[in-house]
Amino acid sequence: MKLRLDPSTQSNYHDVSISKLDWHARIDFDQELLHGKVSFVIQSARVSQALSHIILDTSYLEIKNVTINDIPTPFRVDKRRGFLGSALHIVPADEIPSSKSCILTILYSTTKDCTALQFLKPEQTIGGKFPYVFSECQAIHARSFIPCQDTPSVKVPCTFKIRSKLPVIASGIPCGTANFCNGSLEYLFEQKNPIPSYLFCILSGDLASTNIGPRSSVYTEPGNLLACKYEFEHDMENFMEAAEQLTLPYCWTRYDFVILPPSFPYGGMENPNATFATPTLIAGDRSNVNVIAHELAHSWSGNLVTNESWQCFWLNEGMTVFLERKILGRLYGEPTRQFEAIIGWGELEESVKLLGEDSEYTKLIQNLEGRDPDDAFSTVPYEKGSNFLYEIERVIGGPSVFEPFLPFYFRKFAKSTVNEVKFKHALYEYFSPLGLASKLDSIDWDTWYHAPGMPPVKPHFDTTLADPCYKLAESWTNSAKNSDDPSKFSSKDIENWSAGQKSLFLDVVYEAVSFPHNYIKRMGDVYSFAESKNAELSFRFFKLALKSKYKPLYNTIAERVGSVGRMKFVRPIFRLLNEADRAFAIETFEKYKHFYHKICASQVEKDLGLSE
């Protein structure tokens, strides 16, 4: 197989093998910096070839000192290459024989331009008394707070020793504290399983925790703890047991969940032993717990078995969505799995429409040469990938035939990486002895992998739970087209509906027409979408209002989008606000841009055409 390099790294990871990473860091809340020392156990990755040159990824780092086996070693930091950052070149005084390992140590500090870290002032937190910092490394931001081979192709076991005046969380099992000094402690963590750089995480702030299962705790600010406990304790262990039944025994010892401040840019981030999640999950009625199923599924798909590069991101996210819905199906019935897939298909259609049917970013296998992986981020790898697996399952003979492949797959590639070629080979390896190779042959692999746009096959989903949503949406749409009086609609229309059904209703009416303003007002009044604590509902309704240019809600929408950093909600709202009232959109962004994480702010700037 021809060697394929990850275009999103400048490191020479095919030449340099890293077997262990030991990271010491001190958090400086006053200067909003991190001072670090990272040590790698390295050796040549080439058989019988000495190691003479080491290249690591960095971005906005101040490199202070480099040693190899404690001997000072010259280094050079290249000029920045845009989103790729600045390559760090290290040339040992003497070549390192292929049979010998050594310890490479780098002393450094982050800078104000660090894209992985967000420091929060006390007033930006729930408690309002202490500062806070958290990281977000996916896709290629780890290089901005630690020099590394910043590619998912490289996975290493790690130890973390982090000094802070506030409690710390990192991507490993806590091993205690040590060395109290000047009001701060060292917090120790160990990650025995090899992990890629995008799963490195750090968080420090005013934290409290409580158990939400026999192997799970939730961490958050004290003022939010009881709400988080209620939201997750009912489902956590049930999800873990269902996931293990589908895959392999959980190998990470503990699955802990961290609810972050509202500026966190994603729904969740599957950091091992410390899943980071948005507070928008806290709806008060456990209606967003499917995100737990998704992040938990990453323990196998993504964390245990990792996409080789961001060009085949679907192998992380598509498989994870597929597992997430399998878990929900096991616990709540197959119609629930099918219903979630219907919502996902609608989100995929919206993404393809936004990106363009011929866009490179609508392919399963994407060419990211010269492209920032953050720009490629959409629901495509999630939903197109999941639907591809759904189609393979259908072709091969259904769940009873396909599901036994899952533990085989995760066992085969455990603690390693996978690409689309290896994935396909694994399918043939498993199903050919069962006489099912011809079934796999019937799949149009090239179209699924490389064609842009919607999938070549649309699944036939069970619409039992969706039909009432379609019926009510049709009634609203027809009434609006006929200019009927909307007073006939009442809260009883959606009585006993799940949050998912309400979401689907809003998705369908959003795609149908731009509603008259009296219809938007009536919908808001009788269904209380704008006031909903479930952000999935309120932001869907806000999209509908903006599409219909319903100005009475503009200020409410601006306030809400300025209090939530989750890009799933923020970016669509700003795009629609830009279409409805560009001046107001820019004014709103300028008002709140320092609230957002840099990843989010950067993407919104591009959406609004404000970036250089």
Swiss-Prot record:
Location, primary (coarse class): cytoplasm
Check the record and name the SMART domains matching this protein.
Leuk-A4-hydro_C
Asked if Nucleotide-binding is a keyword of the record, the answer is no
The record places the active site at 295, 382
Q: Where does substrate bind?
A: 136-138, 265-270
Kindly give the Pfam families that the UniProt entry links to this protein: Leuk-A4-hydro_C, Peptidase_M1, Peptidase_M1_N
State the disulfide connectivity: none
Q: Which family does it belong to?
A: Belongs to the peptidase M1 family.
**What's the protein called, per UniProt?**
Leucine aminopeptidase 2
Organism of provenance: Schizosaccharomyces pombe (strain 972 / ATCC 24843)
Gene assigned in the entry: lap2
